[in-house]
Amino acid sequence: MAAPYNPPKKNEDFIFRIALTDISATGSFKANPTIASGDWKVDKDGGGLNDLATLPTVDPAGSIWLKITLSSTEMNADVVAVQGIDQTSPKEWADFAQTILTTT
Protein backbone atom coordinates (compact mmCIF):
# COMPACT_ATOMS: atom_id res chain seq x y z
CA MET A 1 0.00 0.00 0.00
CA ALA A 2 1.32 3.46 -0.83
CA ALA A 3 2.10 6.24 1.63
CA PRO A 4 0.82 7.47 3.99
CA TYR A 5 0.04 4.07 5.48
CA ASN A 6 2.17 0.93 5.88
CA PRO A 7 5.00 0.39 6.07
CA PRO A 8 6.02 3.73 7.62
CA LYS A 9 8.74 5.13 5.36
CA LYS A 10 11.47 7.61 6.18
CA ASN A 11 10.77 11.06 4.65
CA GLU A 12 7.16 10.18 3.72
CA ASP A 13 4.06 11.42 5.52
CA PHE A 14 2.37 8.84 7.72
CA ILE A 15 -1.16 8.62 9.12
CA PHE A 16 -2.35 6.33 11.88
CA ARG A 17 -5.39 6.15 14.14
CA ILE A 18 -5.66 5.44 17.84
CA ALA A 19 -8.26 5.44 20.61
CA LEU A 20 -7.46 7.13 23.92
CA THR A 21 -8.39 5.66 27.30
CA ASP A 22 -10.98 7.67 29.25
CA ILE A 23 -9.28 8.62 32.53
CA SER A 24 -12.63 8.85 34.38
CA ALA A 25 -14.04 5.54 33.10
CA THR A 26 -11.45 2.80 33.45
CA GLY A 27 -11.70 0.25 30.66
CA SER A 28 -13.45 2.66 28.30
CA PHE A 29 -12.25 4.72 25.37
CA LYS A 30 -12.79 8.48 25.43
CA ALA A 31 -15.39 9.58 22.89
CA ASN A 32 -14.67 12.93 21.23
CA PRO A 33 -11.51 13.70 23.28
CA THR A 34 -10.46 17.34 23.60
CA ILE A 35 -7.09 17.85 21.93
CA ALA A 36 -5.14 21.05 22.57
CA SER A 37 -1.95 22.58 21.26
CA GLY A 38 1.02 21.26 23.22
CA ASP A 39 -0.63 17.93 24.07
CA TRP A 40 1.08 16.08 21.20
CA LYS A 41 4.80 15.99 20.52
CA VAL A 42 7.22 14.12 18.27
CA ASP A 43 10.87 13.13 18.71
CA LYS A 44 13.15 12.10 15.85
CA ASP A 45 16.07 9.80 16.69
CA GLY A 46 16.29 11.13 20.26
CA GLY A 47 16.86 14.71 19.11
CA GLY A 48 14.26 16.30 21.40
CA LEU A 49 10.53 16.84 21.55
CA ASN A 50 8.66 19.27 19.30
CA ASP A 51 4.94 19.97 18.92
CA LEU A 52 3.31 18.06 16.06
CA ALA A 53 2.94 20.21 12.95
CA THR A 54 -0.65 18.98 12.53
CA LEU A 55 -2.82 18.71 15.64
CA PRO A 56 -4.52 15.27 15.82
CA THR A 57 -8.23 15.29 14.99
CA VAL A 58 -11.21 13.19 16.01
CA ASP A 59 -12.18 11.45 12.76
CA PRO A 60 -14.96 10.67 12.19
CA ALA A 61 -16.33 13.51 14.31
CA GLY A 62 -17.85 12.46 17.63
CA SER A 63 -16.12 9.06 17.62
CA ILE A 64 -13.33 7.51 19.71
CA TRP A 65 -10.89 7.60 16.77
CA LEU A 66 -8.04 10.07 16.79
CA LYS A 67 -6.25 10.59 13.48
CA ILE A 68 -2.55 11.39 13.85
CA THR A 69 -0.80 12.81 10.80
CA LEU A 70 2.98 13.03 10.66
CA SER A 71 4.58 15.12 7.91
CA SER A 72 7.47 13.91 5.78
CA THR A 73 9.73 16.20 7.86
CA GLU A 74 8.50 14.60 11.10
CA MET A 75 9.13 11.18 9.54
CA ASN A 76 12.72 12.07 8.60
CA ALA A 77 14.26 9.69 11.14
CA ASP A 78 14.98 6.02 11.72
CA VAL A 79 13.03 6.08 15.00
CA VAL A 80 10.07 8.44 15.41
CA ALA A 81 8.46 8.70 18.85
CA VAL A 82 5.03 10.29 19.34
CA GLN A 83 3.66 11.23 22.75
CA GLY A 84 0.33 12.60 23.85
CA ILE A 85 -0.09 14.04 27.34
CA ASP A 86 -3.32 15.83 28.27
CA GLN A 87 -2.31 19.21 29.74
CA THR A 88 -5.67 19.85 31.43
CA SER A 89 -6.29 19.22 35.12
CA PRO A 90 -7.89 16.89 35.80
CA LYS A 91 -6.85 14.89 32.76
CA GLU A 92 -9.58 13.84 30.31
CA TRP A 93 -7.62 10.99 28.71
CA ALA A 94 -4.66 8.78 29.61
CA ASP A 95 -1.14 9.49 28.35
CA PHE A 96 -0.13 7.88 25.07
CA ALA A 97 3.24 6.91 23.58
CA GLN A 98 4.11 5.21 20.29
CA THR A 99 7.43 4.42 18.63
CA ILE A 100 7.53 4.14 14.84
CA LEU A 101 10.44 2.43 13.12
CA THR A 102 10.78 3.70 9.57
CA THR A 103 11.97 1.90 6.44
CA THR A 104 13.65 3.34 3.37
Residue ranges and their predicted role:
Residues 1-104:
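Polar, enzyme-active/binding microenvironments
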